[in-house]
């Protein structure tokens, strides 16, 4: 059932013995936040929204103008099945607005919604899928995370090398309970590394799914005494974790990525736009200092290029048929804000379409081989977070698509991250506390 009215939601609360309601949102970096109300106060919260102090959320508001309001997106209502069945807990994803009802520039869900609306205005339907990788680590005898992976398995391994199969099953079943559609789950190439993919959906639904997926993984892992980490590169000698973003475009019921892609076609121009702005987007798709340790190895790209099938490329076109035809962007990682990341990828593609950019020839070479890559003269992705911030600040494109207030605060906070890590007495310990334990 689609819950589209306040009465639908109130009936759902009564039918499901809900006693506690979470209003969930995220800051501009993709860190999930929430405020909860008792079910008895829900009618007023639905009518008036829930006020909160925006100055206490990183990148949101100044102290002197701090009030913001959460407005729940009613169709996103869901029960949290890992919470008690007596006095259940349910959750909405929310949009953030100003007290007078005006849009708030830091409302990243709203930014993604607007990008999707612009595609629809052109007669284009965009579907997005996400492939999310993560690590599972043992906790010590005091329940604190360690960097000891739960197994020493590799790609597609099974028990006894794979110790995460039962946990992945529990995650997938929980996803189904919450209205999500898991597609594939398997052990990844790193020790203790796993991947679960979701079926494609609209851009906003997929971004919501990424946020919910991370919440589910952490909850199910914690219940089993295991620490789940979405840090892009938690182990120096193992593969990094990516959040590969798959996109397809439809016009008049036809998948524009199916078959040959002409350089000046809509699909070709979309890809050309993504490639043209990929350096500027990197600070949003890869937001941590740790993110840049992943690039250039273990199927994580380093150069701005595309190809078919080739996993050393930034963008690849998988060799599939029908509705599965798509482009895959391989640089994003799970630490990103999915609303901003997907929204900006769409904006870059749209810029390519509107400017009729032509897709350059594919690079059908193994770019993980330094000797091969060195001779091609390809543009590189930023190699550090500081370089990524600079690339974004120099981008005329980003100045036109992002609210100035949001971009300024985002860059400012990112540079603070860089400085804090550099100035830490023990950078490894700083990363453990602030990123490994939290991302």
Predicted regions and their residues:
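Glycine-rich, acidic/polar active-site loops that bind/position phosphate-bearing ligands
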Residues: 1-439
């Amino acid at each position: 059932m689609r819950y589209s009215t306040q009465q639908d939601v109130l009936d759902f609360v009564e039918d499901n013995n809900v006693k506690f309601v979470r209003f969930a949102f995220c800051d501009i970096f993709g860190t999930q936040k929430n405020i909860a109300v008792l079910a008895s106060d829900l009618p007023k919260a639905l009518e008036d929204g829930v006020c909160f102090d925006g100055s206490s959320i990183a990148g949101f508001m100044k102290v002197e103008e701090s009030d913001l309001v959460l407005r729940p997106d009613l169709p996103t209502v869901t029960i949290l099945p890992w919470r008690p069945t007596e006095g259940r807990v349910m959750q909405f994803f929310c949009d953030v607005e100003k007290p007078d009802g005006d849009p708030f520039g830091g409302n990243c869900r709203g930014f993604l919604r607007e990008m999707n609306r612009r595609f629809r205005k052109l007669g284009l339907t965009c579907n997005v899928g996400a492939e999310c990788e993560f690590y599972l680590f043992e906790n010590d005898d005091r329940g604190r995370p360690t960097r000891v992976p739960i197994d020493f398995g590799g790609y597609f391994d099974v028990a006894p090398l794979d110790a995460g199969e039962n946990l992945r099953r529990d995650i997938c079943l929980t996803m189904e309970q919450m209205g999500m559609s898991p597609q594939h789950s398997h052990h990844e190439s790193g020790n203790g590394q796993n991947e679960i993919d979701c079926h494609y959906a609209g851009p906003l639904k997929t971004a919501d799914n990424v946020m919910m997926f991370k919440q589910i993984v952490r909850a199910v892992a914690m219940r089993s005494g295991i620490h789940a980490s979405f840090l892009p590169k938690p182990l120096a000698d193992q593969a990094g974790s990516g959040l590969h973003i798959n996109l397809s475009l439809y016009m008049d019921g036809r998948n524009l990525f199916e078959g040959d892609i002409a350089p000046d076609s809509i699909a070709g121009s979309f890809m050309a736009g993504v490639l043209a702005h990929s350096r500027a987007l990197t600070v949003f798709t890869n937001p941590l200092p740790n993110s840049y340790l992943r690039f250039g190895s273990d199927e994580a790209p380093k150069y701005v290029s595309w190809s078919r099938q080739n996993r050393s490329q930034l963008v690849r076109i998988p060799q599939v048929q029908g509705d599965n035809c798509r482009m895959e962007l391989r640089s994003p990682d799970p630490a990103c804000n999915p609303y901003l990341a997907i929204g900006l990828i769409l904006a870059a593609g749209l810029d390519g379409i509107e400017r009729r950019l032509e897709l350059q020839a594919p690079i059908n070479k193994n770019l993980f081989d330094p000797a091969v890559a060195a001779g091609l003269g390809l543009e590189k992705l930023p190699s550090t977070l500081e370089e990524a911030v600079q690339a974004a600040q120099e981008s005329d494109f980003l100045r036109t698509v992002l609210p100035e207030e949001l971009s300024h605060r985002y860059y400012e906070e990112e540079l603070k991250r860089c400085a804090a890590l550099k100035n830490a007495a023990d950078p490894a310990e700083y990363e453990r506390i602030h990123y490994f334990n939290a991302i």
